[in-house]
Design a protein with these regions (language model features):
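Aromatic-lined glycan-binding groove of carbohydrate-active enzymes
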Residues: 182-209
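Single conserved hydrophobic/aromatic residue that forms the stacking wall/gate
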Residues: 210-219
Length: 219
């Protein structure tokens, strides 16, 4: 999607292709990433693969819109789209966001649909439960998604969402690593009790636990 550095279409394709060659078959994206560019690039790559051979997840909770605001466009380096995003956890916005994602991904269904960052404001959680979650349940009933998930960078709200008994999985970023293991205290036991799959993201804590090899060691 072009964050934090510019990524060309070719580099994006080569990266996805290398992952595929190494046996990776789960791909996660979101409207936020590159304001739609990530979904377009992932969709272009996966359109060349057998649909039954991969698992794809994307997210709802933000809508992409056209903008001439240069600062918004510059958030994602090298982004050729004049787009930005805004939070909206309403039922209608969730349905629209999902349909837009399908178009960008060139798919008629996705395997996992995550609620994305419903902790961005004090009332976001409330609106998500009344709107987005109901829309996701409807999409699952229509069999255009297989699993309902939620992706965020904190575990407290995920523990609360688990009590709704409609989530199949959570994507937790940066909260079960060598640095931060706070999810052990409450979230992981709840996931075990509720049979909710926990997907770990940001396992290197935004590269704090990882550095690229020096040119001398890069053999």
């Amino acid at each position: 999607g072009g964050w934090p550095v510019e990524v060309s279409d070719q580099i994006a394709f080569d990266t996805l292709n290398k992952a595929w060659e190494q046996g990776i078959r789960y791909f996660d994206t979101a409207p936020l990433y590159g304001s739609g560019m990530s979904e377009i690039r992932v969709g272009d790559f996966l359109s060349k693969q057998n649909r039954d051979e991969f698992v794809i997840s994307t997210k709802v909770g933000r809508l992409i819109f056209d903008t001439e605001n240069s600062k918004a466009v510059e958030k994602f380096k090298g982004q050729p789209l004049n787009k930005d995003s805004k939070f909206d956890f309403s039922y209608d916005a969730t349905m629209r966001s999902f349909e837009d994602s399908l178009n960008r991904l060139k798919l008629d269904r996705v395997d996992i649909l995550h609620l994305h960052d419903p902790d961005n404001s004090p009332d976001a959680f409330f609106h998500a439960k009344r709107g987005a979650v109901k829309a996701m349940i409807k999409l699952k009933e229509e069999k255009v998604i297989k699993a309902i998930g939620c992706g965020m960078n904190q575990n407290e709200m995920l523990s609360e969402l688990a009590q709704l008994d409609c989530f199949d999985c959570f994507l937790l970023a940066g909260r079960y690593t060598l640095i931060d293991q706070t999810s052990i205290e409450r979230l992981i036991p709840i996931c075990e009790e509720k049979n909710i799959t926990l997907i770990l993201g940001g396992i290197f804590n935004s590269c704090l636990l990882y550095t690229s090899p020096s040119p001398r060691d890069n053999r």
